[in-house]
């Protein structure tokens, strides 16, 4: 003011500083809506959980060695921030189900770690009248199939899950051979059968000048 002796009030003007938040995800991905900026007046907010396939998140930390854990940014905080994600590798179990086996056992449970390769235990189950074909994650065979003794990796990414592998079986066909010694048989007589085939009545053979005396398993 040009007026002699006048008092002039000057008012300070302020703008909030904006600070940056850097996340070191160590192989993970940030969740949608993760805050990357804040200011001194931002309300206290919790840090969002990132995701990493095959791993369990163990928290955000202020240091690379992950010794100082942090769960939120409080109102009044200032300065750029850097947070480090800590992860634990997931583990899962594999057990074997005979799925109709008549003998044999595989009681052990294999503990596997995500990211590593393991060899499936060789099958020890038996099923009368059936041939073992392999393993499946579904009892009815409509899941993921694995060969006997196959190298597997990451059957599941879920921590603590037990994966049951079910034995898969196909019916074994047995052949019937007729030693006729010059005779003939009816086309009705089967040339094969399965373990669960209903009782078969064999038709008699025919040979000119001879009377058929029956079928035998030895000569």
Go through each PLM region and give its residues.
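Secondary-structure capping and domain/repeat boundary segments
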Residues: 1-219
């Amino acid at each position: 003011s040009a007026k002699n002796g006048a008092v002039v009030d000057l008012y300070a003007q302020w703008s909030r500083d904006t600070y940056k938040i850097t996340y070191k995800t160590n192989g993970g991905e940030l969740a949608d809506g993760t805050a990357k900026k804040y200011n001194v007046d931002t309300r206290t907010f919790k840090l969002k959980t990132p995701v990493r396939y095959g791993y369990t998140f163990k928290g955000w930390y202020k240091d690379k060695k992950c010794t100082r854990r942090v769960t939120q940014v409080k109102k009044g905080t200032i300065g750029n921030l850097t947070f480090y994600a800590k992860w634990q590798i997931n583990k899962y179990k594999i057990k074997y189900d005979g799925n109709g086996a008549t003998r044999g056992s595989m009681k052990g449970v294999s503990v596997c770690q995500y990211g590593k390769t393991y060899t499936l235990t060789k099958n020890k189950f038996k099923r009368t009248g059936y041939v073992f074909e392999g393993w499946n994650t579904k009892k009815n065979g409509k899941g993921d199939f694995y060969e006997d003794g196959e190298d597997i990796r990451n059957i599941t990414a879920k921590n603590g899950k037990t994966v049951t592998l079910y034995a898969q079986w196909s019916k074994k066909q047995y052949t019937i051979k007729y030693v006729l010694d010059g005779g003939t048989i009816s086309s009705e007589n089967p040339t094969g059968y399965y373990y669960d085939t209903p009782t078969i009545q064999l038709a008699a053979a025919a040979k000119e000048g001879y009377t058929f005396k029956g079928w035998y398993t030895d000569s």
